[in-house]
Protein backbone atom coordinates (compact mmCIF):
# COMPACT_ATOMS: atom_id res chain seq x y z
CA UNK A 1 0.00 0.00 0.00
CA UNK A 2 1.28 3.48 -0.88
CA UNK A 3 2.56 5.41 2.11
CA UNK A 4 1.11 8.97 2.30
CA UNK A 5 3.96 10.22 4.51
CA UNK A 6 6.80 9.24 2.19
CA UNK A 7 9.20 12.21 1.74
CA UNK A 8 6.76 14.47 3.60
CA UNK A 9 8.04 17.39 5.68
CA UNK A 10 6.79 17.22 9.26
CA UNK A 11 6.98 20.77 10.59
CA UNK A 12 3.71 21.18 12.46
CA UNK A 13 1.30 18.67 13.90
CA UNK A 14 -1.16 20.26 11.47
CA UNK A 15 0.84 18.70 8.63
CA UNK A 16 -0.68 15.40 9.76
CA UNK A 17 -4.34 14.46 9.33
CA UNK A 18 -6.17 12.26 11.80
CA UNK A 19 -5.54 9.31 9.46
CA UNK A 20 -1.84 10.21 9.33
CA UNK A 21 -1.68 10.32 13.12
CA UNK A 22 -3.34 6.92 13.38
CA UNK A 23 -0.85 5.54 10.84
CA UNK A 24 2.14 6.84 12.81
CA UNK A 25 0.77 5.50 16.10
CA UNK A 26 -0.03 2.08 14.62
CA UNK A 27 3.49 1.94 13.16
CA UNK A 28 4.98 2.93 16.52
CA UNK A 29 3.08 0.12 18.24
CA UNK A 30 4.39 -2.40 15.70
CA UNK A 31 7.97 -1.19 16.10
CA UNK A 32 7.68 -1.35 19.88
CA UNK A 33 6.45 -4.94 19.67
CA UNK A 34 8.76 -6.02 16.84
CA UNK A 35 12.07 -4.11 16.49
CA UNK A 36 13.40 -3.61 12.95
CA UNK A 37 17.18 -3.08 13.31
CA UNK A 38 17.86 -2.98 9.56
CA UNK A 39 14.84 -1.05 8.29
CA UNK A 40 16.90 2.07 7.47
CA UNK A 41 20.20 0.28 6.95
CA UNK A 42 21.19 2.24 3.82
CA UNK A 43 19.88 5.64 4.91
CA UNK A 44 21.88 8.61 6.21
CA UNK A 45 20.06 11.06 8.49
CA UNK A 46 21.27 14.50 9.61
CA UNK A 47 20.68 15.41 13.25
CA UNK A 48 20.97 19.22 13.23
CA UNK A 49 20.45 20.79 16.64
CA UNK A 50 20.96 24.55 16.54
CA UNK A 51 19.62 24.70 20.12
CA UNK A 52 20.55 22.63 23.16
CA UNK A 53 18.57 19.44 23.71
CA UNK A 54 18.97 16.27 25.74
CA UNK A 55 15.89 14.07 25.45
CA UNK A 56 14.81 15.01 21.94
CA UNK A 57 18.26 14.72 20.38
CA UNK A 58 19.21 11.48 22.14
CA UNK A 59 15.78 9.99 21.47
CA UNK A 60 15.95 10.82 17.78
CA UNK A 61 19.53 9.59 17.39
CA UNK A 62 18.77 6.38 19.30
CA UNK A 63 15.77 5.86 17.03
CA UNK A 64 17.97 6.29 13.96
CA UNK A 65 20.62 3.86 15.20
CA UNK A 66 18.06 1.24 16.25
CA UNK A 67 16.63 1.26 12.72
CA UNK A 68 20.11 0.80 11.26
CA UNK A 69 20.58 4.29 9.80
CA UNK A 70 23.85 6.21 9.73
CA UNK A 71 23.75 9.49 11.65
CA UNK A 72 25.65 12.73 10.99
CA UNK A 73 25.16 16.18 12.44
CA UNK A 74 25.85 18.46 15.40
CA UNK A 75 24.44 19.23 18.84
CA UNK A 76 25.49 22.89 18.96
CA UNK A 77 25.58 25.36 16.08
CA UNK A 78 28.42 27.36 17.69
CA UNK A 79 31.07 25.25 15.99
CA UNK A 80 29.40 25.12 12.57
CA UNK A 81 29.94 27.46 9.61
CA UNK A 82 26.62 29.06 10.51
CA UNK A 83 27.82 29.80 14.03
CA UNK A 84 31.46 30.66 13.33
CA UNK A 85 31.41 32.13 9.83
CA UNK A 86 27.94 33.58 9.56
CA UNK A 87 26.64 31.17 6.92
CA UNK A 88 22.90 31.51 6.38
CA UNK A 89 20.47 28.81 7.45
CA UNK A 90 19.37 28.55 3.81
CA UNK A 91 22.90 27.73 2.65
CA UNK A 92 23.50 25.33 5.54
CA UNK A 93 20.37 23.34 4.71
CA UNK A 94 21.07 23.48 0.96
CA UNK A 95 24.46 21.84 1.54
CA UNK A 96 23.36 19.29 4.16
CA UNK A 97 20.50 18.13 1.94
CA UNK A 98 23.01 16.98 -0.68
CA UNK A 99 24.51 14.56 1.85
CA UNK A 100 21.54 12.90 3.52
CA UNK A 101 18.15 11.24 3.11
CA UNK A 102 16.38 13.22 5.86
CA UNK A 103 17.06 16.16 8.17
CA UNK A 104 15.98 16.30 11.81
CA UNK A 105 16.27 19.89 12.99
CA UNK A 106 15.85 21.94 16.16
CA UNK A 107 16.25 25.71 16.03
CA UNK A 108 15.51 28.54 18.51
CA UNK A 109 13.81 30.69 15.86
CA UNK A 110 10.11 30.24 15.18
CA UNK A 111 9.55 29.31 11.55
CA UNK A 112 13.11 28.10 10.97
CA UNK A 113 12.05 24.53 10.25
CA UNK A 114 9.46 25.67 7.70
CA UNK A 115 12.12 27.87 6.08
CA UNK A 116 14.45 24.87 5.86
CA UNK A 117 11.93 23.00 3.70
CA UNK A 118 12.35 25.66 1.01
CA UNK A 119 16.02 24.71 0.60
CA UNK A 120 16.10 20.94 1.25
CA UNK A 121 14.78 19.84 -2.14
CA UNK A 122 13.18 16.40 -1.89
CA UNK A 123 14.89 15.68 1.42
CA UNK A 124 12.22 15.65 4.17
CA UNK A 125 12.70 17.95 7.16
CA UNK A 126 11.43 16.81 10.56
CA UNK A 127 10.94 19.60 13.07
CA UNK A 128 12.42 18.74 16.48
CA UNK A 129 11.26 22.09 17.90
CA UNK A 130 11.37 25.66 16.57
CA UNK A 131 11.34 28.27 19.31
CA UNK A 132 8.04 28.37 21.18
CA UNK A 133 6.17 27.41 18.02
CA UNK A 134 5.81 23.67 17.29
CA UNK A 135 7.20 20.35 18.54
CA UNK A 136 5.32 17.72 16.49
CA UNK A 137 7.36 14.66 17.43
CA UNK A 138 6.85 15.34 21.14
CA UNK A 139 3.15 15.40 20.34
CA UNK A 140 3.38 12.03 18.60
CA UNK A 141 4.96 10.39 21.63
CA UNK A 142 2.39 12.11 23.86
CA UNK A 143 -0.46 10.74 21.74
CA UNK A 144 1.15 7.29 21.70
CA UNK A 145 1.40 7.34 25.50
CA UNK A 146 -2.17 8.57 25.96
CA UNK A 147 -3.50 5.91 23.62
CA UNK A 148 -1.44 3.23 25.36
CA UNK A 149 -2.63 4.18 28.85
CA UNK A 150 -6.23 5.20 28.14
CA UNK A 151 -7.01 2.93 25.19
CA UNK A 152 -8.33 5.79 23.07
CA UNK A 153 -7.72 9.34 21.85
CA UNK A 154 -11.30 10.58 21.93
CA UNK A 155 -13.77 11.38 24.74
CA UNK A 156 -10.93 12.28 27.10
CA UNK A 157 -10.64 14.94 29.79
CA UNK A 158 -7.18 16.53 29.56
CA UNK A 159 -5.74 19.15 31.93
CA UNK A 160 -2.69 21.18 30.90
CA UNK A 161 -0.77 22.98 33.63
CA UNK A 162 1.97 25.61 33.83
CA UNK A 163 3.54 27.49 30.94
CA UNK A 164 0.82 27.34 28.33
CA UNK A 165 1.93 30.53 26.55
CA UNK A 166 5.46 29.57 25.52
CA UNK A 167 5.17 25.79 25.87
CA UNK A 168 5.25 24.49 22.30
CA UNK A 169 4.36 20.99 23.49
CA UNK A 170 0.93 22.02 24.77
CA UNK A 171 0.16 23.98 21.60
CA UNK A 172 0.90 20.99 19.39
CA UNK A 173 -0.84 18.49 21.68
CA UNK A 174 -4.02 20.55 21.89
CA UNK A 175 -4.13 20.88 18.10
CA UNK A 176 -3.63 17.14 17.71
CA UNK A 177 -6.25 16.09 20.25
CA UNK A 178 -8.70 18.50 18.63
CA UNK A 179 -8.62 16.21 15.57
CA UNK A 180 -10.39 13.56 17.68
CA UNK A 181 -13.98 13.80 18.90
CA UNK A 182 -15.37 14.50 22.34
CA UNK A 183 -12.22 15.71 24.08
CA UNK A 184 -12.53 18.23 26.92
CA UNK A 185 -9.67 20.58 27.86
CA UNK A 186 -8.85 22.23 31.19
CA UNK A 187 -6.17 24.96 31.05
CA UNK A 188 -4.46 25.82 34.34
CA UNK A 189 -1.92 28.63 34.19
CA UNK A 190 -1.05 32.04 35.61
CA UNK A 191 -2.49 34.88 33.57
CA UNK A 192 0.96 35.81 32.24
CA UNK A 193 1.37 32.30 30.80
CA UNK A 194 -2.17 31.56 29.60
CA UNK A 195 -2.90 29.46 26.52
CA UNK A 196 -2.68 31.67 23.39
CA UNK A 197 -5.95 32.98 22.02
CA UNK A 198 -5.42 31.35 18.62
CA UNK A 199 -5.51 27.92 20.29
CA UNK A 200 -8.74 28.77 22.11
CA UNK A 201 -10.23 30.11 18.87
CA UNK A 202 -9.28 26.86 17.11
CA UNK A 203 -11.07 24.83 19.78
CA UNK A 204 -14.14 27.02 19.46
CA UNK A 205 -14.16 26.56 15.69
CA UNK A 206 -14.07 22.79 16.17
CA UNK A 207 -16.78 22.86 18.83
CA UNK A 208 -14.45 21.50 21.53
CA UNK A 209 -15.15 22.18 25.21
CA UNK A 210 -12.50 24.03 27.23
CA UNK A 211 -12.26 26.01 30.46
CA UNK A 212 -9.71 28.07 32.40
CA UNK A 213 -8.84 27.27 36.02
CA UNK A 214 -6.74 28.71 38.82
CA UNK A 215 -5.61 25.49 40.49
CA UNK A 216 -5.00 21.81 39.86
CA UNK A 217 -7.33 20.86 42.71
CA UNK A 218 -10.32 22.29 40.84
CA UNK A 219 -10.13 19.60 38.16
CA UNK A 220 -8.25 16.67 39.71
CA UNK A 221 -11.29 14.40 40.04
CA UNK A 222 -12.41 15.01 36.46
CA UNK A 223 -9.35 14.36 34.30
CA UNK A 224 -7.87 11.33 32.56
CA UNK A 225 -4.58 13.06 31.72
CA UNK A 226 -2.77 15.71 33.77
CA UNK A 227 -0.14 17.26 31.49
CA UNK A 228 2.37 19.25 33.53
CA UNK A 229 4.90 21.69 32.06
CA UNK A 230 7.78 23.67 33.49
CA UNK A 231 7.97 27.43 33.43
CA UNK A 232 10.63 27.99 30.77
CA UNK A 233 13.31 30.19 32.32
CA UNK A 234 15.03 30.70 28.98
CA UNK A 235 11.91 32.33 27.52
CA UNK A 236 11.12 34.76 30.37
CA UNK A 237 12.86 37.73 31.95
CA UNK A 238 14.20 36.99 35.47
CA UNK A 239 11.57 38.98 37.36
CA UNK A 240 8.68 37.32 35.51
CA UNK A 241 10.23 33.87 36.00
CA UNK A 242 10.58 34.37 39.75
CA UNK A 243 6.95 35.45 40.03
CA UNK A 244 5.35 32.49 38.28
CA UNK A 245 7.63 29.43 38.58
CA UNK A 246 6.26 28.23 41.91
CA UNK A 247 2.56 28.91 41.32
CA UNK A 248 1.60 25.43 40.10
CA UNK A 249 3.37 22.53 41.82
CA UNK A 250 2.05 18.94 41.89
CA UNK A 251 2.60 16.90 45.06
CA UNK A 252 1.62 13.31 45.80
CA UNK A 253 -0.99 14.53 48.28
CA UNK A 254 -2.69 16.46 45.46
CA UNK A 255 -3.50 13.16 43.74
CA UNK A 256 -6.07 12.15 46.35
CA UNK A 257 -9.38 11.80 44.56
CA UNK A 258 -7.83 11.34 41.12
CA UNK A 259 -9.34 8.78 38.76
CA UNK A 260 -7.73 5.36 39.17
CA UNK A 261 -6.23 5.34 35.67
CA UNK A 262 -5.35 9.04 35.53
CA UNK A 263 -1.80 9.55 34.30
CA UNK A 264 0.53 12.47 34.94
CA UNK A 265 2.58 13.36 31.87
CA UNK A 266 5.39 15.89 31.40
CA UNK A 267 7.56 16.66 28.35
CA UNK A 268 10.58 17.07 30.68
CA UNK A 269 12.90 18.40 31.97
CA UNK A 270 11.15 18.62 35.30
CA UNK A 271 12.37 21.35 37.63
CA UNK A 272 10.18 22.07 40.68
CA UNK A 273 6.69 21.61 39.26
CA UNK A 274 6.38 17.92 40.18
CA UNK A 275 7.78 16.83 43.53
CA UNK A 276 9.70 13.56 43.61
CA UNK A 277 7.12 11.86 45.85
CA UNK A 278 4.79 11.82 42.84
CA UNK A 279 7.25 9.49 41.06
CA UNK A 280 6.29 6.60 43.34
CA UNK A 281 2.57 6.83 42.61
CA UNK A 282 0.82 4.76 39.92
CA UNK A 283 -0.26 8.02 38.28
CA UNK A 284 3.29 9.08 37.36
CA UNK A 285 3.95 8.17 33.73
CA UNK A 286 6.43 10.78 32.46
CA UNK A 287 9.45 8.50 32.32
CA UNK A 288 7.53 5.87 30.35
CA UNK A 289 6.30 8.74 28.19
CA UNK A 290 9.89 9.78 27.44
CA UNK A 291 10.76 6.19 26.57
CA UNK A 292 7.92 6.10 24.06
CA UNK A 293 9.72 8.83 22.14
CA UNK A 294 11.93 6.14 20.64
CA UNK A 295 9.00 4.32 19.04
CA UNK A 296 7.09 7.41 17.90
CA UNK A 297 10.20 8.85 16.24
CA UNK A 298 11.17 5.50 14.76
CA UNK A 299 7.71 5.31 13.22
CA UNK A 300 7.96 8.77 11.69
CA UNK A 301 11.44 8.14 10.29
CA UNK A 302 10.37 4.79 8.87
CA UNK A 303 7.36 6.34 7.16
CA UNK A 304 9.03 9.40 5.64
CA UNK A 305 11.91 7.28 4.30
CA UNK A 306 10.01 4.33 2.81
CA UNK A 307 7.62 4.69 -0.12
CA UNK A 308 5.94 1.46 0.97
CA UNK A 309 6.13 0.09 4.48
CA UNK A 310 5.03 -3.36 5.58
CA UNK A 311 5.79 -4.39 9.15
Swiss-Prot record:
Alphabetized InterPro entries for the sequence: Asp/Orn_carbamoyltranf_P-bd (IPR006132), Asp/Orn_carbamoylTrfase (IPR006130), Asp/Orn_carbamoylTrfase_sf (IPR036901), Asp_carbamoyltransf (IPR002082), Asp_carbamoyltransf_Asp/Orn-bd (IPR006131)
GO MF: amino acid binding; aspartate carbamoyltransferase activity
Binding site for L-aspartate: 85, 168, 230
Keyword Transferase listed: yes
Record text on subunit structure and interactions: Heterododecamer (2C3:3R2) of six catalytic PyrB chains organized as two trimers (C3), and six regulatory PyrI chains organized as three dimers (R2).
Primary role: Catalyzes the condensation of carbamoyl phosphate and aspartate to form carbamoyl aspartate and inorganic phosphate, the committed step in the de novo pyrimidine nucleotide biosynthesis pathway.
Family: Belongs to the aspartate/ornithine carbamoyltransferase superfamily. ATCase family.
NCBIfam families: asp_carb_tr, PRK00856.1
Name the UniProt record assigns to this protein: Aspartate carbamoyltransferase catalytic subunit
Amino acid sequence: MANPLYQKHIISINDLSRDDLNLVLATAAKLKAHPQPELLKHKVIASCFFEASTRTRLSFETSMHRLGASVVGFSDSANTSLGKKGETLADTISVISTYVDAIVMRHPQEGAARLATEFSGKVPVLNAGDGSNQHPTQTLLDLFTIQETQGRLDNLHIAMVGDLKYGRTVHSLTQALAKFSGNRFYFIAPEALAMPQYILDMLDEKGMDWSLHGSIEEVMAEVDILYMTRVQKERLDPSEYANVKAQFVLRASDLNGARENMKVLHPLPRIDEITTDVDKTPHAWYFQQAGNGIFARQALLALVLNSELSL
